[in-house]
Amino acid sequence: MQQNTSLYDSLNVTAAASTSEIKKAYRNAALKYHPDKNNHTEESKRKFQEICQAYEILKDNRLRALYDQYGTTDEVLIQEQQAQAQRQQAGPFSSSSNFDTEAMSFPDLSPGDLFAQFFNSSATPSSNGSKSSFNFSFNNSSTPSFSFVNGSGVNNLYSSSAKYNSNDEDHHLDRGPDIKHNLKCTLKELYMGKTAKLGLNRTRICSVCDGHGGLKKCTCKTCKGQGIQTQTRRMGPLVQSWSQTCADCGGAGVFVKNKDICQQCQGLGFIKERKILQVTVQPGSCHNQLIVLTGEGDEVISTKGGGHEKVIPGDVVITILRLKDPNFQVINYSNLICKKCKIDFMTSLCGGVVYIEGHPSGKLIKLDIIPGEILKPGCFKTVEDMGMPKFINGVRSGFGHLYVKFDVTYPERLEPENAKKIQNILANDKYIKAERSTMETADSDCYCDLEKSYDSVEEHVLSSFEAPNLNNEVIEDDDLGDLINERDSRKRNNRRFDESNINNNNETKRNKYSSPVSGFYDHDINGY
């Protein structure tokens, strides 16, 4: 016969669960499905009774053993199963039953009484309902309250749908919300690391009165410390009885006299404080990385009803936001791109020295361009180990790479004599010859054949490219407009360029950085 596990399923435990696990599961389920916390819906009442019945059987070792063996604790059903088993073993003429009905005695407790007894609260069984410090009544004759009160009738001043006792170790507390904050950091701060101070406004339990609102509490005489009042009314031959929250103590069962009110929190049980937190940003931290300060959130939160509720403190979650850097961009967490490295035409052809300022390390980066290595406009070169600090599985592992994008600035024109010299030099270069030999249009004979294929050829000399008057004209070709804008931009940039200093450009840069600096890196660059 397959084992019946419906009682275990009600508590959401397995059949092999220990007594402590069953007790813990019952506590959580009873608090979750208690009718007072679910607006006394029919589903919550049914579920609560089912949970209590399951716990009443499974907490008792003898009843649990019977349930595990027979799948029920009903005396009649068990006797039938025993008789059937004996008939199968001894034959059809044997019939006897040694079932002990003593194990089937149940305490006369309602679900509300069982719930109150489990949480060490006073409970008084009643034919109309269960009256306890939880004030759960099945007759639902009045709007019930739900307050946790310990055996001595003491609770704190936090009240919403429930009043929590700060001294009840078995009481379940919800986790409070996290406090979120954004921390803006520059690229240099992420490279070097930093320590920031964060001012946080939060609500904490009063350390003087431990959340009770006073050092001395008095028992409410109206409800005699129960937190509830029972009233009766005679209607002819019938007597109606109902329970409601005590109006004098608010259901707490106790109150604090004015002379005993805690001066630190003024009887509230909590205080608002401003905490200065030290936030450490590790070197190599990334954009949108989280820093979690565990348990630094609010210990008391406000409820929708205007009250306050004690909670498990949430965390302070800080999100790192990297500010935009004008010169560098981070890719793949640890690599850097230098977006604006301008070099002149001569350096791109003949080599030289290029300096990069503003590196997040605070160092001046010196790049030696090898003569003969032509730098094309927009090309990338790699400087190893000059990126951001790199981490692998949380362990620091060197640095990323620095990728430099070169922007070549061309002169407006060259002197004809120098242009002729450059042409003669380039014509005899073996690399130029090899490249020209691979181009179909490099040979002049090809141009001759091209000219012969046309009836007429007009020959012109380029002049200054002047932008047309666009006041009364519409240009439909977007490429022409882009070409004009690019030409004007280059013309303005080259107008500021002093042609007399072209030959002394490298010497000027060396003189510029001759003063002492905090650090100086000299690197060769590699192809990207």
Swiss-Prot record:
It is found in: Cytoplasm; Nucleus. Residues 4-73 form the J domain. One of its GO terms (molecular function) is protein-folding chaperone binding. Residues 485-528 are annotated as: Disordered. CXXCXGXG motif repeats lie at residues 206-213, 218-225, 246-253, 262-269. GO terms for biological process: protein refolding; protein sumoylation; protein unfolding. Disulfide bonds: none annotated. Keywords: Chaperone, Cytoplasm, Metal-binding, Nucleus, Repeat, Zinc, Zinc-finger. Gene3D superfamilies: DnaJ domain, Heat shock protein DnaJ, cysteine-rich domain, Urease metallochaperone UreE, N-terminal domain. Its main location: cytoplasm. Present with 125 molecules/cell in log phase SD medium. This is J domain-containing protein APJ1.
